[in-house]
């Protein structure tokens, strides 16, 4: 058996946390041969801490062979101590009458604190995934607040958009999700994201050619993927928690264990690829190997795609401007 690794999860007693923790503890994220120690963070509020205790009791009651230990805390420095992986799930949701700029600032405070704590106590190789929205900008803030950790260690979750897009394309083309390769999502995890199947194939056949419906792409596909979260809230009365947790598992598993040359989508700090300014936390097609991701290079960006990429980039630049005074 391998040595246990430490996995920190924030917002651990929330909806997504509840869908996530049991899957991490069962080995779905890091493999069936990798023991884990869960380090669980919740806000310093009695109700949340009580709920966290209940979740930990349930984790105990599963008797997972791979769960080598567990702590629950309200202190980020305890939760992130020596963490090898950190899933930052907890964030402040938008309340009634709250402007987006207010939301950015409120979450900015949270992610500055968490970035600083990671900087101070986490493993120097910690892999950080920000799930809490606005995920790209929260990840950017955490990254900027952790100057002693490599910027590449910080990522934002676009895998939910990616997975949503996969299923829509599979259903339209009449192919199996598992057979689709080379689909990607560019930009921000928001309705402005650009899901792109121009390069995608199923069993070697071009999906763009198979679908061959530009009107569907623009008027049905992109709005459906972009507004899927809102559609789920409307239908279920609650936000998409299980599918978000599933996407977080996918993102971390692929980052840790590799994609064998397959493309996946990750929000990563730009290296200037495709004209995206350096440092912007942006969804790109990537491949991963040995715990490192690489942005897929050399893809042609046509006029429609450039327009959509600029649109989502502009939103990210506006978000960055809104919190510019908070991060150096």
Curated annotation (Swiss-Prot):
UniProt-listed Pfam families: Ldh_1_C (PF02866), Ldh_1_N (PF00056)
Keywords, alphabetical: NAD, Oxidoreductase, Tricarboxylic acid cycle
Enzyme active site: 189
GO biological process, one term: malate metabolic process
Amino acids binding NAD(+): 11-17, 107, 114, 131-133
Reactions accelerated catalytically: (S)-malate + NAD(+) = oxaloacetate + NADH + H(+)
GO terms for MF: L-malate dehydrogenase (NAD+) activity
Coiled coil: none
Residues given in the record as substrate binding sites: 94, 100, 133, 164
Function in brief: Catalyzes the reversible oxidation of malate to oxaloacetate.
Record-stated family: Belongs to the LDH/MDH superfamily. MDH type 2 family.
Name listed for the protein in its UniProt record: Malate dehydrogenase
